[in-house]
């Protein structure tokens, strides 16, 4: 990523959760430990099915008396509905602020040039009252600015950055093996732990129970992880969703995301594969 560029990620949506029971509510649902999320630290997490299958993933940022969830926009309405199903009588308010706030990405180098910035995944600080986060999944993916739409142009000028197409950012994310687009195609098809969430700092195996915890822990503790979500490159032709992948006539996986930045669930033929 170029130090002088900024990428407005219009594919991201924003939920804001607050209320008397908000910490307990999130802690009982998601894969990471919400107690770790502070004004200066944000984390990556996911919401799974009771069987441990993937549903949603997001970055959680502390904001005022609640939490911001930065999620793929095409999934935001479904995530909003799912959280409201779990809410029941909890004193929790869930707001969709996707039309008011946006997410913009800058390079790690630009982030570290800002005053008081630290080279730590998830490190969070304020820039003109807006949160800016060094990506908790992989700091090489740069930092994310969660900002009111009306303030975006002013901040871009003040930071002396050039706006570029988000495709450059997503291409780099694909190279790093982090799926951020068309993640709805993963729903109920793949275990959360197969999405590399442990490697992306998205699962805390020491926290208490959460939705899907039993299967996730079993796969981890019994060393049952034999498949992973990996980026693939199309050399020729076209990819189809659920298309099988072969190596020397042996089926090793299938395509799950077949769009511009494709991913496939790949089996390990070698247990020592890193």
Identify the residue ranges that each predicted region occupies.
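Acidic, proline/glycine-enriched N-terminal capping motif
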Residues: 1-57, 61-64
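Short amphipathic beta-strand starts and helix->beta connectors
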Residues: 1-2, 43-57, 87-88, 124-132, ...
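Acidic, low-complexity central loop/insert segments
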Residues: 5-9, 13-16, 59-176
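Short, surface-exposed ligand-recognition loops at beta-strand->loop->(often short) alpha-helix junctions
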Residues: 16-21, 36, 106-111, 233-240
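Short, intrinsically disordered, mixed-charge
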Residues: 27-35, 77, 81-89, 116, ...
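Glycine-centered loop/turn motifs
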Residues: 40-41, 116-126, 238-243, 274
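Glycine-rich, small/acidic residue-mixed loop/short-helix segments
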Residues: 54, 193-203, 213, 217-274
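Anionic-ligand-binding alpha/beta catalytic cores of soluble enzymes and soluble regulatory domains
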Residues: 138-229
